[in-house]
């Protein structure tokens, strides 16, 4: 062995330790043969080393076998490196052997996937557990599933949801649906901690009890519903029967009410006649007693007819008739038996009208209104000479019917009759009135005459309406388009100037600018044509201008202004020039201002002053 000089500096690669670093050891397990050769090729083969130094042991560049690298890992015991390769997914098995991978042994510490899988199962079971407010049927169902099966949770999931739903619905029908708030509040924390124990205890305690309670509770509402249905059916039948009986008795009641009103009106007429014509007491008493007895008998009949349907009806139907029936019953009860006990007719006259005042006030009040509205022919006095005595008797019931409709209280009519029946009643009245008073035909003939007289006026109005649109507006030219203006110019006799108007877009509103000063700008330079076109436009627009003796006229100026222009020059002529001489020389007498009124005023002033002076002299 050759000695190494003292000046020799060993490289960092030479002092490599045999123990591999942890960072590089991970690569050795999965390394290929090519990579191992590259690592060994970095060492210098020519250097001599001491056999005594462990750090100077040479690493031979020869290729090593795959089996030789395994005991290095066993001697040095690097469990962390093997743990990194094993940590794959959760539910995966041990790593499979490949041609390039080294064989490794699994330590007991590599059971971490089983721990994680157990944790995941627990979390899945906690999530799949029912909430705190689950029904008892669901708790019982899941309990039975857990007791039957020993496999994990994922396998024991029900594959037929329809069966599960049917079971849950059948069990839910047999058990009460709601819990008390106290039980739910106490059971929630227990379910989160020990769900299995809670489910077993609750099912054992509450299976027998709630079934009996629920059957009793379910029978109660069924019995109540059957009772309600049995009660409602006879009520409906009774209501229908009462309605039919009321409809049958309604026309009879109306007839009785009309009879009452007839009697009351006859009494009022007789009383008015008696007040006008006094009669002896002997004649008055029996007639009054007869009328009172008639009243009492009729009212007693009304009482019987009105009370019988009221007994049959239910309280619900009685409320629909409202107040008018109650008023009639009260009046009949008060006045039904009293007239027979009282003998004196004077006392009867005072006592009987008191309860019937409310019912008789309304029919008696509208009499003056009816007398105003009805024609003179409706009155009995006017109908006597025109018609025989037989028709006068028929006139009274028609009038009474009208008074009953107008004067009777609206509440009673609405409660006793429908709209359809009232309409039929009104139609009957109209037919009766037409039979009694055929003068209505005369009014129809008058309306026909009026229509015939109106016809010529309508014809005149139609003729006026037709003539108005034919009139042309005064300023129709304002709506003309440039093409229409060009046609108008060609009609005047200047078709060569059409393009001048169309190119300059001169419509009807711009015709006011068509004059001798603007026509040359449009391209019309002939002086005679300019004069003719400007003249026709003035006529069309209604502009009046004086005819000038020459075509181009000087601008209008004031006479005084023109005079001062001449007077402003220096010289003998300008100095001696006066306004009157200038006006005469220029021929501007027509443009002189009117001074006649001012001259008269100036002349009147001295006259007034002379008169005032004379008055002053006389006063002095």
From Swiss-Prot:
Q: List, alphabetically, the Pfam families matched.
A: SAM_1 (PF00536)
Matching Gene3D superfamilies, A to Z?
Answer: Transcription Factor, Ets-1
| InterPro entries in the record | SAM, SAM/pointed_sf
Query: Where do the segments described as Disordered lie?
Result: 1-394, 594-620
Q: Where is the composition biased (Basic residues)?
A: 233-242
- Amino acid composition bias (Polar residues), ranges on this chain: 181-191
Q: Where is the composition biased (Acidic residues)?
A: 261-270, 609-620
Regions of biased composition (Basic and acidic residues) lie at 62-83, 106-125, 135-180, 271-286, 295-315, 323-337, 347-382, 594-604
* Record-annotated SAM domain positions: 480-543
Official protein name in the record = Sterile alpha motif domain-containing protein 15
Gene field: Samd15
